[in-house]
Amino acid sequence: MGMFEAISEKSGPLRVVIDTNALASDELRAFLSASSENRAILPDYVAMERFKPDNLRALRDGFSVIRPFADQVVILKGTGEISRLNPDAEPLPQAMVDADQTEAFGEFCELLDRALEGEASLLRQLRERAEWAQTQMSVVLKGASDFPADLAEFEAFFTASDVAHMRRGGTLTPEMHDKFDTAVGAVAHSIFRSAPSPLTYPSPKNWPNHFILRNAFCNGVYMLSFIQRGIGARKPEKARNDVVDVLLATYGTYFNGVMSNDDLTNHVHHISRFLLEADGVRLAPDYLQLLAEAAGHEPPTPDEAARSIEGA
């Protein structure tokens, strides 16, 4: 019995968010093969990253591993729509799912084949959709240019002594953890206030489950990684990529983690889980932790995860 079979049998069906860089991996194939109940969760950004008007063949090739498991693929709603969901109405992992796109995934793969075989009308439609996806991606990534100002604003919640402590490799003290939570809350409230149309606040119990708060939390962990290393700037193209990495880490906290080969994504996700659980937020178990336990290994500590990001 393989490791994925072992943890699926013990823990039940697993739902794991898949990064673009893991779409064609043997790990994903093993995960889906282990149980017909396991699910590969695809956020909109995963499709957007692969959806390029001039290279639809790469899109088809990128789906080569998951295509035979089309009924195990779950497509999420757009991040903008998810940001408006109120967790008081329905638990977010269920409410996030785009039922229509999920049901149509297998058919989409077949249409992609037909388009690439020369069916002009389908090819045109897919290229138009790809152009739309790239436009949406550009809108989302636009805010990445504000990185230096955002970092300085976040760092201002901590004292010079706090920052020095972090740069010496110290972990967050309880007081610093409280400051972190305050900073994250301030960012989330600011987003609520600046929304183009009014957003409904959830109950205090469900505030940590709202996507805006959860993404602000993961983004705060991302900011901490730069404060700890004394880095005050980020190349625009890297900052744009980081936006997607943090979003994937955020999605992973709603499911059984994120399957990714990216150090930043894994770091932000792991530390965010650790801090959320320290705040009393209940999360589904991370599949990597389940694998480590099944193999008799301890999962990485927050300090070990922090060291993995050096040089990212």
Predicted region positions:
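Active-site-proximal, substrate-binding regions of enzyme catalytic domains
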Residues: G2-Y254, L264-A312
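Conserved residues at the C-terminal ends of beta-strands
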Residues: N261
